[in-house]
């Protein structure tokens, strides 16, 4: 069994996916919401999986005062918040493990908590990492695009990892929701997979042909030619460069990282500070799930999910295109325009991305609305939102409906983790032999 710790666990998406993949044992988990007294995500996590080896404490406090409570493990997983990756945070973290300086951002310290665990474990640090984040991580911050991701990659290579990443839209691979996220896999020096990659004559073969991510999520280079699946440095679309300098220098670098440059494409790998990266398109020819596939029977839908005729005008306005004059609260006139969004949502395609504001009766531009019969409309239920993320029904049943929607807006698509988990497990044991 591959032993796992799950950080920033939420309601347990990584755990559900790895349980479905089989061959993994979650030996410790942490979920802490610093901004509220109530801890609904952690409560749901323990309701599903039990409270043994689960921590509902500030991870910084755990690392500072209870580091030995974090067991040794083979795989660290987590969907860390995408906020501020300032190296000053790292210095602050190393000195106090707390944010007391007021440096911009409130959750950037959470990346450095992963780093602190890897450093603290030393020779016993995990062989593998599986991380998830919003895809715009590759382009943060807007004034120095790619800087934050470079800091993450550089800090991991300093700890002896080969790192690959891939932007995966779940719907591109048959799943029922269009949810685009960057997934990061890292392999430590000495691990079976690291040894294999390190011995490859051409490291790009790992991300183009037979790697942990390419096998379950095959992609081809995006060069406008549907017939061209060959990848090499002869193709101008594949880029190679070095990440140079200390973490502090990377943070201040405004030459490499500019408002217009985009150094990191949606597929890539880094070894010893050398990056190979390219933009790619999905290559999937299997079955596709749609929004219509996850709907409950109408007789099971509570009445409050149906849209009343009196609210329909507001829904239509918010969903529609706008090209109008508006006035601010201070009396300043301005022009406002935006395009229409699909209304109602198509049932024969994967859904739009679930957002945290999905719950509640109030009309909204972004909530999903379906037409269940001519002229009869409703919102999606918590169970349907769970199904769009490929959780089991009622995974979040301990929370109120609006909070359940919020939690699903923060969750990942379990099917992605399941496929990555199966691939990692297979490759680990194959190369171990």
Features from the language model and the residues they span:
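C-terminal target-recognition/interaction regions appended to catalytic cores
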Residues: 254-433
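Residues that flank catalytic or metal-binding motifs in active/ligand-binding sites
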Residues: 152, 164, 178-182, 350
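Conserved S-adenosyl-L-methionine
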Residues: 56-57, 135, 161-172
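Core alpha/beta nucleotide-donor-binding catalytic domains of modification enzymes
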Residues: 2-125, 134-147
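Short glycine-biased active-site loop of nucleotidyltransferases that positions the nucleotide triphosphate
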Residues: 67-69, 174-177
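A structural motif corresponding to the C-terminal end of an alpha-helix
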Residues: 113-128, 155-160, 391
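Conserved Class I S-adenosyl-L-methionine
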Residues: 144-164
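Flexible, glycine-/basic-rich loop-and-beta segments that form/coincide
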Residues: 175-262
């Amino acid at each position: 069994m591959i032993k796992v710790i799950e950080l920033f666990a939420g309601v347990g998406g990584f755990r559900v996916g790895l349980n479905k993949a089989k061959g993994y044992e979650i030996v410790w988990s942490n979920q802490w919401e610093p901004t509220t007294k109530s801890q609904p995500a952690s409560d749901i996590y323990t309701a599903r999986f039990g409270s043994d080896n689960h921590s509902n404490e500030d991870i910084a406090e755990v690392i500072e005062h209870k580091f030995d409570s974090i067991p040794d493990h083979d795989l660290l997983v987590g969907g860390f918040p995408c906020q501020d990756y300032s190296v000053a945070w790292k210095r602050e973290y190393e000195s106090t493990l707390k944010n007391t300086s007021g440096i911009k951002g409130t959750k950037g310290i959470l990346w450095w908590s992963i780093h602190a665990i890897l450093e603290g474990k030393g020779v016993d640090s995990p062989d593998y990492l599986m991380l998830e984040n919003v895809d715009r991580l590759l382009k943060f911050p807007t004034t120095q695009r790619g800087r934050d991701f470079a800091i993450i990659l550089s800090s991991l290579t300093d700890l002896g990892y080969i790192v690959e990443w891939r932007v995966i839209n779940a719907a591109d691979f048959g799943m029922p929701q269009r949810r685009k996220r960057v997934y990061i896999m890292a392999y430590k020096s000495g691990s079976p997979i690291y040894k294999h990659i390190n011995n490859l004559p051409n490291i790009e073969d790992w991300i183009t042909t037979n790697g942990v991510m390419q096998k379950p999520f095959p992609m081809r280079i995006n060069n406008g030619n549907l017939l061209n699946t060959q990848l090499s440095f002869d193709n101008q679309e594949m880029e190679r460069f070095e990440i140079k300098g200390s973490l502090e220098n990377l943070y201040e670098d405004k030459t490499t990282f500019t408002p217009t440059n985009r150094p990191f494409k949606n597929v890539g790998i880094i070894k010893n500070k050398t990056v190979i990266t390219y933009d790619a398109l999905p290559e999937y020819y299997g079955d596709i799930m749609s929004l219509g596939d996850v709907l409950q029977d109408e007789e099971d839908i509570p009445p409050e999910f149906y849209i009343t005729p009196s609210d329909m005008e507001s829904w239509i306005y918010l969903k529609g295109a706008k090209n109008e004059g508006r006035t601010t609260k201070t009396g300043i006139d301005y022009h406002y325009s935006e395009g229409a969004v699909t209304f109602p949502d198509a049932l024969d395609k994967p859904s739009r991305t679930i957002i945290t504001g999905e719950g509640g009766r109030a009309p909204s531009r972004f909530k999903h609305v379906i037409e269940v019969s001519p002229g009869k409309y409703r919102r999606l239920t918590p169970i349907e939102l769970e199904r769009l993320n490929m959780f089991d029904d009622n995974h979040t049943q301990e929370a109120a409906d609006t909070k359940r929607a919020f939690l699903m807006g923060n969750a990942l698509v379990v099917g992605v983790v399941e496929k990555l988990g199966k691939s990692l497990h297979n490759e680990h044991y194959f190369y171990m032999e």
